[in-house]
Amino acid sequence: MTGLQSLFTEGKAKVIQAVGYPQPNFSHFRATDIWMSGSNSNQEVYSGWAGRYLNYEYPNFPTGYPNTDMPDPLAIQIGSSTTLTSQGSTANMGMSITNPTTFYNLISGTVDPAPATPAGKELTYIRTVNQQTQQYSTVIKAAANAVTQQGAYPANNSLGDQLKIVARLVSGGLKTRVYMVNFGGFDTHSVQVNAGDTTTGTHATLLQRVSDAIKAFQDDLKQMGVEDRVVGMTYSEFGRRIKSNSSTGTDHGAAAPMFLFGSKIEAGMLGVNPTIPANASVNDNIPMQYDFRSVYATLLEKWFCLDKTIVDSLFPPGINAQLQSLPLIKAGACNTVTPPAPGNDEVLI
């Protein structure tokens, strides 16, 4: 992971040790919902932590959007569909794209009025979203076309491909606040490592690709003059167990490290290396040191400049008592606007 190590040395990366939550759930679907919603493991929450933030900052969305204050998408998911992360109380606050060029498909024309029925209300909503998509496609195309040169990204690296799109749109002038990308393959129940050399194998290859992609992204942002606007964060719904199983893999675990990156990150290591018991079994987990909701809350307060009382209100009942303010963002990075004015420059990926 030489790329991430280089950023760490440059003061642009942070490792948070053993991030998790109490009473972890080991189902892929349920654990993903917990991480995206910011809920406790015994709570069913149908909105996302970023969606609730965007719903606070841009009330009544999608009605009245885009507008002069916020002409751009609020959140963008690079992929085929939006996720729970950007789900607000009544609508998903984001949109998904695969590529700025192929996405652009401007359609114009008039439509018949919707009937005054429940089905008509649904049709009106669908038309509103469709119209927004057409309008947003125009600004996305313009932002993409505003960038004529980018830095080099690693070949055959899907994460790098996604981050390259994000860098292009940020540099091109989109005011979008949150971008989401994804990179899979880490569910290594078997063949996580090569039996002859456990420093190599599937897991090592995946981490190298993550490292290379993040380094290329950060370098690209720097050469385009926008690195101070962007903070990045990694997460997964699981850690892995302490001890490998009989298939040279590891099963679903509890706590895991998170990486943060950007020029405004308070770089370094947060937390201590976990103590590994000599007699650990395949069922043992790394103990949690930090609650993942504290990471979210700190970014909302210190990067998106929200008052702590507002931050607390954006989490499900009972969560605010668990939240810590963590040393993740450099002092002065927040522009101290509370509540934040629409279109502030801070971007989270």
Protein language model annotation of sequence segments:
Residues 220-228, 232-251, 259:
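Hydrophobic alpha-helical bundle architecture
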Residues 254:
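Glycine-rich and small/hydrophobic secondary-structure elements
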